[in-house]
């Protein structure tokens, strides 16, 4: 039996023998593609190549691509564990042609691999083609020799492939495997096609078109080929099993899942869910995603929590999910070394998330169970589903999963309506602005010269206004200029774009920002003098001081990144950065606040490298060579075949396309100004360098001097004086609180108390006290009386504050919150609370006596009723 591991290698080796360049899997996070939540196909990393935007030094490629389908259009989560072939994470075997071979060779390669390399019986194979694709039919029938009756024309989207609503697309041909007559199901295109007898194993897409947002299509620059064959699916065929979960890789994970959950039935769908989900979670974390309440982090959290619940369902009594990581590394670590490198981070993240979820799941399940007990039909309301999501962290699909197990459904539309209301509430007010620059899709190439110079003579290739090409631009009109060569750095890798001037005979264009569009560099700004035309000659000048300050901050981020790893641990991976002339911002993975001692260690390490004045060296080399040198590749960054490696002594070596200082000493000084959390498991450091670091130090020193002068202290006794002052303030606050309490007690004789039956009613205004004192007095009344209604107010200038207490024994007669609303209506205020306690305030103290009189009447009327 061929193992999954062997099959993966056999596929790569076959296509390498056909002159295909083996390219590593790209990240599950599609870089620079906002149309996709996750990488869901092998061609995603080559999308710009198919569009003609990006050039490669090879025209044939083979990959084994990590893919995820658990959000957005491509979402298989609900079916995972309950069918034979649905997964969240899967591996896609693929071979690609970029304007090289087309239909004849693509079909021939696939047929040879299936029938010669892995020796599938020809009589077991069927194919489909797009109904009008006569060229593909001729290749199958005339060149391959496949009988006409085994070639099925399909006139539907099944045989016309697209990655999404926009992007590369084209007709495809699919190869199916026949599991035999003893398995239910019919041929593709028949009513029985959804059965398991005929299984699609390979999809070959002939990339001929680019689909635009309006639905129209245009020809791609060169016809290309994109193929995909699910590794798990073809493994099942070769291992003679009908379910992907029966292949060797999944069986190992399922057995481990049974062991750690103590499940009795190894055939339980829950174990399949767990085995599938550990792959998705581990690879997402390894690719830099951490659990969160939105975006990709929320999808990860959903998958983790779904796995946890299925573990609890089959018997897990303690945290278990992280225990599968070791077996996953054993099964897939050889093919994906990131699992080995990030194993500790993966396990720690899963442990933390499971502990967090277990704290809330019990209460959530109680709410769920209580709701279904009171159901009048078989539908759980969207409001309840939203409460479970918003309060207890239950993803909608988890609630739907629990409902399905009990034969119920959830009102998804009502849930989505609640979600929309929440989004609308949190949406920032503001006018919507169209970013016309994002509409620019330039096809020209600009040569970047800015590593070695800040001044360059250049020629105008394109001018844009409102996203449209124009022949010229006039003064004060926002515009974008594309040059044949430029010293201006375009924003990327966290570094902001340069600022400066484009000047020529009779004109001056101020550059406010610089971005990229394909291989074009966009100079964004406006003309302040004269007129600028296509083909004009000009001089491009980068503002030197902002560039130098930005370079210092960028180099400092490299030193900071390394220092974080040395002080906090290897898990401290970069999650994002922002580098400009004023500061640097660095986001990284770490699960707790950094101590003052750790911050000092980090600053010392960075400043030691600055004082060492190491040369900052740059080499350009292949990705493989860079990796062998130990260069750090950063999360979310997209690299070409040739990469730029930045080294700072023996301390730091990273792949980077940004601008840097010549020597670490040019950074001057490094100072951290803030550190805090921005998401679960993600911290942020902000820091300054050079003159700004010195000024920051001066500012803090001046503050300390001012404090010393105010306290008449010196360096030796400053801390003791502050501690003494704080202790004195604390004692005085206690004394003030005591005096206020005595004041209130002394006023008790003036407080009007009445009895309505056996209920004591207290309504009074007391000046000179605070809300805490009022609360304490209310508690005193309630502790001494089994049936009491107490309304106490205090005024300060125009302001009114109040506290209301009602004994629990009489909250069925009247509620504190209702009294608060009544009082608020008379003092231009607002307030509320529980049935037994409420508080609030208002802005009209002038008629407080009249307001309290109305409250007395309100209480009397409600009690009598």
Curated annotation (Swiss-Prot):
Q: Where in the cell is it found?
A: Cytoplasm
What residues bind Zn(2+), as annotated? 554, 558, 656, 660
One GO location term (cellular component): cytosol
For this protein, the record's InterPro entries field holds: aa-tRNA-synth_II/BPL/LPL, Ala-tRNA-lgiase_IIc, Ala-tRNA-ligase_IIc_anticod-bd, Ala-tRNA-synth_IIc_core, Ala-tRNA-synth_IIc_N, Ala-tRNA_ligase, Ala_tRNA_ligase_euk/bac, DHHA1_dom
Q: Which domain of life is it from?
A: Bacteria
Which note does the record give on the cofactor?
Answer: Binds 1 zinc ion per subunit.
| Chief localization | cytoplasm
Q: Is Membrane there in the keyword field?
A: no
Q: Which SUPFAM superfamilies match?
A: Class II aaRS and biotin synthetases, Putative anticodon-binding domain of alanyl-tRNA synthetase (AlaRS), ThrRS/AlaRS common domain, Translation proteins
Q: Which reaction does it catalyse?
A: tRNA(Ala) + L-alanine + ATP = L-alanyl-tRNA(Ala) + AMP + diphosphate
Q: GO terms for molecular function, please?
A: alanine-tRNA ligase activity; aminoacyl-tRNA deacylase activity; ATP binding; tRNA binding; zinc ion binding
The protein's required cofactor(s) are namely:
Zn(2+)
Instruction: List S-S links within the chain.
Output: none
Which top EC class is given? ligase
EC number of this enzyme: 6.1.1.7
User: PANTHER family, alphabetically?
Assistant: ALANINE--TRNA LIGASE, CYTOPLASMIC, ALANYL-TRNA SYNTHETASE
Q: Which family does it belong to?
A: Belongs to the class-II aminoacyl-tRNA synthetase family.
Instruction: Name the job this protein performs.
Output: Catalyzes the attachment of alanine to tRNA(Ala) in a two-step reaction: alanine is first activated by ATP to form Ala-AMP and then transferred to the acceptor end of tRNA(Ala). Also edits incorrectly charged Ser-tRNA(Ala) and Gly-tRNA(Ala) via its editing domain.
NCBIfam families per UniProt = alaS
| Full protein name | Alanine--tRNA ligase
- Species of origin reads Francisella tularensis subsp. novicida (strain U112)
């Amino acid at each position: 039996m061929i193992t999954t591991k062997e099959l993966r290698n056999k596929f790569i080796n076959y296509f390498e023998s056909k002159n295909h360049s083996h390219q590593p899997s790209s990240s599950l996070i599609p870089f620079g593609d906002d149309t996709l939540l996750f990488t869901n196909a092998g061609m995603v990393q080559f999308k710009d190549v198919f569009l003609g935007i990006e050039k490669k030094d090879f025209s044939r490629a083979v990959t084994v691509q990590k893919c995820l389908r658990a959000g957005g259009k491509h979402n298989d989560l609900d079916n995972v564990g309950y069918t034979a072939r649905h997964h969240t994470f899967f591996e896609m075997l693929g071979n690609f042609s970029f304007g090289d071979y087309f239909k004849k060779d693509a079909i021939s390669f696939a047929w040879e691999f299936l029938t010669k390399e892995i020796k599938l019986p020809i009589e077991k194979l069927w194919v489909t083609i797009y109904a009008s694709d006569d060229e593909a039919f001729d290749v199958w029938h005339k060149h391959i020799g496949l009988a006409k009756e085994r070639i099925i024309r399909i006139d539907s989207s099944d045989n016309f492939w697209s990655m999404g609503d926009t992007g590369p697309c084209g007709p495809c041909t699919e190869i199916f495997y026949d599991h035999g007559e003893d398995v239910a199901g019919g041929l593709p295109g028949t009513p029985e096609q959804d059965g398991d007898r005929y299984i699609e194993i390979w999809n070959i897409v002939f990339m001929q078109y680019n689909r635009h947002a309006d639905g129209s299509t245009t020809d791609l620059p060169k016809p290309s080929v994109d193929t995909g064959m699910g590794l798990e699916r073809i493994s099942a065929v070769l291992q003679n099993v009908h379910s992907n979960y029966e292949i060797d890789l999944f069986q190992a994970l399922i057995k481990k899942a049974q062991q750690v959950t103590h499940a009795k039935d190894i055939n339980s769908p829950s174990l399949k869910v767990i085995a599938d989900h550990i792959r998705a979670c581990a690879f997402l974390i390894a690719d830099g995603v951490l659990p969160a309440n939105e975006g990709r982090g929320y999808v990860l959290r959903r998958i983790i929590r779904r796995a946890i619940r299925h573990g609890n369902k089959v018997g897990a009594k303690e945290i278990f999910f992280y225990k599968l990581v070791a077996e996953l590394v054993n099964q897939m670590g050889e093919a994906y070394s990131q699992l080995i490198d990030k194993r500790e981070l993966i396990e720690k993240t899963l442990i933390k998330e499971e502990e967090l979820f277990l704290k809330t799941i019990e209460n959530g399940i109680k709410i769920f169970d209580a709701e279904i007990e009171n159901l009048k039909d078989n539908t759980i309301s969207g409001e309840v589903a939203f409460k479970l999501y918003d309060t207890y962290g239950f993803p909608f699909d988890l609630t739907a999963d629990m409902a399905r197990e009990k034969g119920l459904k959830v009102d998804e539309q009502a849930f989505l309506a609640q979600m929309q209301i929440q989004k609308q509430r949190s949406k920032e007010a503001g006018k919507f602005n169209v970013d016309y620059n994002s509409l620019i899709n330039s096809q020209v190439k600009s040569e970047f010269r800015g590593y070695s110079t800040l001044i360059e003579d250049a020629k105008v290739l394109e001018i844009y206004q409102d996203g449209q090409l124009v022949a010229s631009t006039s003064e004060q009109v926002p515009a974008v200029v594309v040059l044949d060569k430029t010293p201006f750095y375009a924003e990327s890798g966290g570094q902001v774009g340069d600022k400066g001037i484009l000047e020529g005979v009779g004109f001056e264009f101020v550059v406010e920002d610089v971005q990229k569009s394909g291989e074009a560099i966009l100079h964004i700004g406006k003309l302040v003098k004269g007129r600028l035309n296509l083909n004009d000659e000009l001089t491009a000048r980068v503002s030197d001081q902002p560039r130098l300050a930005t370079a210092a901050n960028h180099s400092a981020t490299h030193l900071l990144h390394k220092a974080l790893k040395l002080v906090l641990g290897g898990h401290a991976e970069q999650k994002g950065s922002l580098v400009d002339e004023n500061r640097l911002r660095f986001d990284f993975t770490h699960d707790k606040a950094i101590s003052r001692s750790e911050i000092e260690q980090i600053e010392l390490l960075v400043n030691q490298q600055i004082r060492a004045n190491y040369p900052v060296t740059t080499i350009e080399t292949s990705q493989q060579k860079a990796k062998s040198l130990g260069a750090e590749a950063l999360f979310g960054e997209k690299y070409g075949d040739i990469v730029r490696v930045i080294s700072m002594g023996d301390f730091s070596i990273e792949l980077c396309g940004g601008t840097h200082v010549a020597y670490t000493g040019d950074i001057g000084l490094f100072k951290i100004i803030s550190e805090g959390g921005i998401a679960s498991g993600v911290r942020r450091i902000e820091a300054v360098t050079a003159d700004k670091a010195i000024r920051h130090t001066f500012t803090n020193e001046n503050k300390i001097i001012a404090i010393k002068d105010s306290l008449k202290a010196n360096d030796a006794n400053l801390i003791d004086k502050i501690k003494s002052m704080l202790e004195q303030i604390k004692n005085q606050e206690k004394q003030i609180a005591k005096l206020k309490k005595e004041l209130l007690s002394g006023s008790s004789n003036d407080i009007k108390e009445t009895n309505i039956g056996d209920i004591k009613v207290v309504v009074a205004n007391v000046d000179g006290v605070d809300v805490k004192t009022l609360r304490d007095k209310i508690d005193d009344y309630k502790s001494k009386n089994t049936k009491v209604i107490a309304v106490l107010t205090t005024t300060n200038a125009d302001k009114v504050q109040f506290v209301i207490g009602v004994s629990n024994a009489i909250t069925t007669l009247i509620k504190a919150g209702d009294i608060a609303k009544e009082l608020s209506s008379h003092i231009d205020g607002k307030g509320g609370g529980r049935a037994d306690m409420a508080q609030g305030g208002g802005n009209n103290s002038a008629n407080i006596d009249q307001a309290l009189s109305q409250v007395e009447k309100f209480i009397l009327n409600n009690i009598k009723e």
